[in-house]
């Protein structure tokens, strides 16, 4: 496995209309590593994802994905191609409520979803199983699915095209407390089997304990990312 960090952020600053700009002093994500970061609200989390993917550039600092700076990509076509390396699991991703869950899962593979081609249907079933979605949901309208199934649908679509880096925005925000740890286990299993690096922007400690190798908290005033203190009693 390469020793080049999957994601590296150094001295990053980006203003976005909040009381303070988004600052990240230093973050290095090893290949295959999973990290949670608490301390970013929904707007800051979206900005973080945009910075990592190069959709937005920082006013200061450097962001590198697999050794390459996002600032080095100046061509729109090249940038679009670079997005293949990212999977983004977010509630901002549109689910077609009137379509079946299978049709929603088929969309990353093409727009021909009525009917779903046999080969694509097989890939959809395998993807659902991998992400912890019971197969009986596939023929049901997506709008009828519970929050846990929808969260796993966002996860499944994010990994469908084999990205190298998975970004999750508050993935358990809509989940019942009883499902948060299991979702963390499901997401960790998916990342492990695919050798995915991942950053989850979440303050959910139960999810983080099941999902992450490291859990960090952003200090907004300085941009420091701190780990929980050890307790000796």
Regions found by a protein language model. Name each.
Residues 53:
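Helix-to-loop junction immediately C-terminal to a conserved catalytic motif
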Residues 61-72:
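Conserved ABC transporter NBD signature motif
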Residues 70-87:
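ABC ATPase NBD coupling module
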Residues 92, 98-113, 123:
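Q-loop/switch helix immediately C-terminal to the Walker
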Residues 119-137:
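Conserved ABC ATPase "signature" region
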Residues 141-146:
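Conserved ABC ATPase signature
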Residues 155:
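Hydrophobic anchor residue at the start of the ABC signature
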């Amino acid at each position: 496995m390469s020793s080049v960090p999957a994601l590296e952020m150094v001295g990053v600053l980006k203003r976005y209309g909040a009381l303070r700009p988004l600052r990240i002093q230093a973050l290095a994500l090893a290949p295959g590593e999973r990290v949670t970061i608490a301390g970013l609200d929904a707007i800051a989390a979206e900005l973080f994802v945009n910075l990592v993917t190069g959709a937005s550039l920082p006013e200061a600092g450097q962001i590198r994905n697999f050794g390459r700076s996002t600032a080095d990509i100046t061509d729109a076509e090249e940038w679009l191609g670079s997005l293949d390396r990212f999977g983004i699991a977010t509630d901002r991703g549109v689910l077609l409520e009137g379509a079946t869950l299978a049709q929603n899962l088929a969309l990353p593979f093409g727009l021909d979803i009525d009917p779903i081609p046999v080969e694509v249907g097989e890939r959809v079933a395998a993807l659902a199983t991998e992400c912890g979605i019971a197969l009986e949901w596939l023929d049901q309208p997506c709008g009828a699915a519970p929050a846990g199934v929808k969260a796993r649908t966002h996860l499944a679509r994010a990994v469908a095209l084999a990205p190298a880096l998975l970004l999750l925005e508050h993935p358990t925000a809509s989940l019942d407390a009883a499902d948060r740890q299991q979702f963390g286990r499901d997401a960790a299993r998916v990342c492990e089997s695919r050798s995915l690096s991942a950053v989850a922007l979440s303050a959910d400690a139960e999810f983080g304990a099941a999902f992450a190798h490291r859990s960090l908290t952003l200090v907004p005033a300085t941009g420091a990312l701190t780990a929980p203190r050890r307790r000796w009693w």
